Amino acid sequence: TLHDADIYYWNAVAQHELVFVAQAFRTSIQQLVEVVRHRVEVEYIDRNDLLIAEVKLNDADFQLLQTRDNAEIARLALNSFAGVNPSDTLPIDHSVIALKQFIPLSDEIDNAITSRPEYRIAQNKIELQESSRKIADARFLPQFHIGVDGSYSSPGYNFKSDLDPNYAIYAKLSIPLFEWGKRKSTRNASSYAINMAQQNLSKAQDKIRLEIQTAHYNYKQAIDKVKLTESSLSKASESEQMAMERYKEGNVSIVEVINAQLYHQQAQVNYIQSKLNAQMAKTDFERAIYYLREKE
């Protein structure tokens, strides 16, 4: 389905984007190592800061390997879903598209409900029960039949040698007699079946409406989180730059610089995750209102 295709596609894009984040983080740590090494060489600080920075560089290398593995697994999963060779490389976006606006929940929600297969199945069951009641009622209604019957006889009344046809037209009226309440019990059973089918339709309608409203709420919340994490990302980037400048000036420790780098990296990860969640919430909402199924 298109819903599953969206999941595989955007997950592959997100994992690919996380590789760039890991690469950027490693580059940032590498720059810190160079700064610390220079300060050690001029004997401005001891080697402890350099050891701390080099350990973080190893951690950054490890994270980069992990993100590349995750990206490759996501790529293979996308290829498998698309039915292409594992060695093929499908073209994808370099980053998850950030959704900033959501599809409004219009007044046409009732149309969205009636387009769902669950609703149509429940409605068809009502029509089926109503047809069954009509068939059952027909057994107890008077039935009028008209027919023609004929025969040949020889000789005729005028003593001719040819066969003489004789026709008879008849009419028959069948009236069902009292059957010990069978008609009433049959109609009651039919009415009960129709009422149950109508209740099931109402339940299906309520369930679909709740699903649509919940999907729309999650979609809206996901958009808000994209905006929030985007704001945090901008602040975290600025904080890292300030921490590095203050470290060069000797005003903060290396731990504060590394923490600022980690906060920036986490802000990037959160931003990508929020963008991915928004795309998933969007496709969930579209499926709930049947947009995707209509395209299939």
Question: Can you say where each PLM-predicted feature lies in the sequence?
Answer:
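Periplasmic alpha-helical coiled-coil/stalk elements that build and connect Gram-negative outer-membrane
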Residues: 1-111, 218, 222, 264, ...
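Amphipathic alpha-helical coiled-coil segments
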Residues: 3-20, 38, 74, 121-136, ...
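Membrane-embedded beta-strand positions in outer-membrane beta-barrel channels/transporters
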Residues: 9, 145, 170-172, 216
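Residues on the lipid-exposed face of transmembrane beta-strands in outer-membrane beta-barrel proteins
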Residues: 78, 171-175, 274, 285
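Metallo-beta-lactamase
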Residues: 67, 117, 197, 274
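Small/polar (Gly/Ser/Thr/Ala-rich) solvent-exposed segments
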Residues: 1, 16, 120, 127-130, ...
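Hydrophobic, lipid-facing positions within transmembrane beta-strands of outer-membrane proteins
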Residues: 108, 167-173
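Bacterial Sec-pathway N-terminal export signals of envelope proteins
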Residues: 86-88, 92-127, 177, 205, ...
